[in-house]
Amino acid sequence: MGSMSIWHWVIVAVIVMLLFGRGKVSDLMGDVAKGIKAFKKGMAEDETPPAVQAAPPPAEPVRTIPHATETSPGTAIPASHLPGGERKPV
């Protein structure tokens, strides 16, 4: 049961021709060729860069919301927020 010889492929081709008929096989091969051509055309269109790109929409300004736990530099953090209850400058 090694590789398939040429005679195996000939027998398979004859069986396919008997099952599907000559007309269906040629139609199928034509459809495959059309699909390959359409694929190549699509790939060629993707390679060409677009001539004019649309401007990106203007960005909305970012709003920041300060947290209630933020402190300004030089202020102490409440003892309830520190482990051990110590007060340390920030």
UniProtKB/Swiss-Prot annotation:
One Pfam match: TatA_B_E
TM helices/strands, residue ranges: 1-21
GO CC list: TAT protein transport complex
GO biological process assignments: protein transport by the Tat complex
Subcellular compartments: Cell inner membrane
GO MF annotations, alphabetized: protein transmembrane transporter activity
Keywords of the record: Cell inner membrane, Cell membrane, Membrane, Protein transport, Translocation, Transmembrane, Transmembrane helix, Transport
InterPro entries: TatA/B/E (IPR003369), TatA/E (IPR006312)
Topological category with respect to the lipid bilayer: Single-pass membrane protein
Gene3D superfamilies on file: 1.20.5.3310
Disordered, as annotated region: 44-90
Function according to Swiss-Prot or TrEMBL: Part of the twin-arginine translocation (Tat) system that transports large folded proteins containing a characteristic twin-arginine motif in their signal peptide across membranes. TatA could form the protein-conducting channel of the Tat system.
The family this protein is said to belong to: Belongs to the TatA/E family.
SUBUNIT field: The Tat system comprises two distinct complexes: a TatABC complex, containing multiple copies of TatA, TatB and TatC subunits, and a separate TatA complex, containing only TatA subunits. Substrates initially bind to the TatABC complex, which probably triggers association of the separate TatA complex to form the active translocon.
Protein name: Sec-independent protein translocase protein TatA
Organism per entry: Methylobacterium radiotolerans (strain ATCC 27329 / DSM 1819 / JCM 2831 / NBRC 15690 / NCIMB 10815 / 0-1)
Gene, per the UniProt record: tatA
